[in-house]
Amino acid sequence: METILGMTAIAVALLIGMGALGTAIGFGLLGGKFLEGAARQPEMAPMLQVKMFIVAGLLDAVTMIGVGIALFMLFTNPLGAML
């Protein structure tokens, strides 16, 4: 039982940690490309900004789904019934 709980804790930590890391990298790339595009064509900046916020929302949604799955694994522990 302790092995399953330990592995579940490791899986939750990896899921949340890698999700946060991926989101941070994604936001960095997204912001950099937005600034590059706005500097290259300033008249397109409002349209690019709207698209950037849509993609940023989708990027956050993926991380929140991962956090939800991690909390499900942590509190309900579907693997505990295997014992």
UniProtKB/Swiss-Prot annotation:
Membrane topology of this protein: Multi-pass membrane protein
GO annotation, cellular component aspect: plasma membrane; proton-transporting ATP synthase complex; proton-transporting two-sector ATPase complex, proton-transporting domain
SUPFAM superfamilies associated with the record: F1F0 ATP synthase subunit C (SSF81333)
Single biological process term from Gene Ontology: proton motive force-driven ATP synthesis
Keyword annotations of the record: ATP synthesis, Cell inner membrane, Cell membrane, CF(0), Hydrogen ion transport, Ion transport, Lipid-binding, Membrane, Transmembrane, Transmembrane helix, Transport
Residues marked Reversibly protonated during proton transport (site): 60
Gene transcribed to yield this protein: atpE
Assigned protein family: Belongs to the ATPase C chain family.
Subunit annotation: F-type ATPases have 2 components, F(1) - the catalytic core - and F(0) - the membrane proton channel. F(1) has five subunits: alpha(3), beta(3), gamma(1), delta(1), epsilon(1). F(0) has three main subunits: a(1), b(2) and c(10-14). The alpha and beta chains form an alternating ring which encloses part of the gamma chain. F(1) is attached to F(0) by a central stalk formed by the gamma and epsilon chains, while a peripheral stalk is formed by the delta and b chains.
GO MF entry, a single one: lipid binding
Pfam families per UniProt: ATP-synt_C
UniProt-recorded name of the protein: ATP synthase subunit c
Gene3D superfamilies (alphabetical): F1F0 ATP synthase subunit C
UniProt-annotated location(s): Cell inner membrane
PROSITE patterns the record matches: ATPASE_C (PS00605)
Functional description taken from the UniProt entry: F(1)F(0) ATP synthase produces ATP from ADP in the presence of a proton or sodium gradient. F-type ATPases consist of two structural domains, F(1) containing the extramembraneous catalytic core and F(0) containing the membrane proton channel, linked together by a central stalk and a peripheral stalk. During catalysis, ATP synthesis in the catalytic domain of F(1) is coupled via a rotary mechanism of the central stalk subunits to proton translocation.
Residues that span the membrane, as ranges: 10-30, 52-72
